[in-house]
Amino acid sequence: MDLIRNTIEGLLYDFPIELMGNYITKDDSIDINEILIDIIKRKDVSFTQTDISLLSEVINDTWCTDAEFGISPETSSLTNRILLLMTEFSKHVLNLAGLHNPTVRFNELLRWRTLSLKVGEDILVLPLLARYDTLCRIKRKRFLWPMVLEHDNLRLNAILDEELSDTHSHINAATDVFEFNWLRLMNMPGRKKDKGTFWISSAKKDYDLISRASNNHYPLPCWAVIAATVRAMLWASVTENEDACPITRVMVEEMLESEDSIYNKLESLNPLIATFLENALETSNGIKIDYAIDARDFISDVPSSPYLVHHGERNFLYQWFKSFFDNEHGARENADLMLLYLIIKCKVRREFVQTNNLRGFVNFQDYDHEKVSTLDTEEEKWEKAFREITYRYAVQTSCGDKKRFNLEARVTPNNIRSVRKMNYRQAIFGDSDFLQRNDNPSITLIAHFIKGVDKQKNEFTCRHADLRKTLKKQMNQIINRIGEYSMGNGPHLIGLDAAGSELGCPPEVFAPFFRYAKLHGLTNFTYHVGE
């Protein structure tokens, strides 16, 4: 089991994108199997040379065959079969039963978590679901489970279903930053911010020796556009809209050969996505976040679950893999394009989700800085609506629909008013309520002040003069609105927090401001140390 887990990680997480692109453009000198084995040898020294020498044969003849569907080395190349690695792994780890949501076998939970942390859960779940449903001759329409699957330990689940409190939740970190940004990249390709994000320099890949050794001749924005193109092309195929789709495999190959061609193809891609979005389900505040969330699938009722946000990507993967097992819509012939799509997705994901091996607060901050939108929509109304969706998602997925869980969310002082004004009771899609009417999630707020190193070396000013001025301004804003923040239907402000490393910013900087707040009725204070 560990060997197949390492193989999948090597394929999706470590495999150089440009080599996969070169393979698709008919570079016969590239051996996917050979490269994959070389990656595993370099990453995991726990396997012997004998283990590794047998791996190539096992991949080709055992893991990447499926007799039930006539998929074997005699019928297709390894590249068109290698996605079977996911079903081979997941069938030993997941429980499937009819149309119920999948669960993880408790005794396999560590192996599942170790791999899904690197590549995400949906990539491992949807292929197995598609295979299972094809064999059972059923087709599911809704994919509304949490981003982290539940396990099958009923006694432990019963304990976890009791009332719980999260007293240190960073609300930005609870928004599934990567998932939301990926939806925007796939539905608004080519539109990006020019600074402050991984688009300028994918720095986190430099921590990884395999990534550093690979010649990534395109920056990540280009690969994201290619992924959006592949997704639109495959979506048109599985939904039988190929006649209206101007994107062809030849066009994708041209994009892989020339960077200029990538953005030229946006002239065909953006109108196609706009056509797909005509049938997309709108959120309650009137935006369409994913063309694969088809409104025609929810004519009778729109689920109030916040996980409907993920339905589109899951629906796309499910329909494509179902076509793969049914041998329809040219899915098997385009399996290498799906593999390219998944590799690009994992490369972008590793820029948002902390999966590298570094430790310490600086590494944490590198990822924390990515908890923002990567795209510039140029539309303030759209941006505001999207922000409300992400915050509503964070609160609803944390608190649950039965108010069993209590959330103490940390927000910056400047965001308190906007966070309090948001309607967390209303469902993200449709007109229904996520909670019962006149009910609100159990959420309270902590004002989150950020420590800073003293940058002004001047004998005529006190230490941290600029930070003290900022703290004074922010604290006065809070004190002047303390009555507003402590009443009404929105989340109440109940305390203050000084976050970040105390190195270079001792408690003396915050002490007078905390005393000032205490005089005005705030008595709940926390101060981060040891980071």
Where are these regions (language model features)?
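Metal-cofactor-binding active-site regions of metalloenzymes
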Residues: 1-531
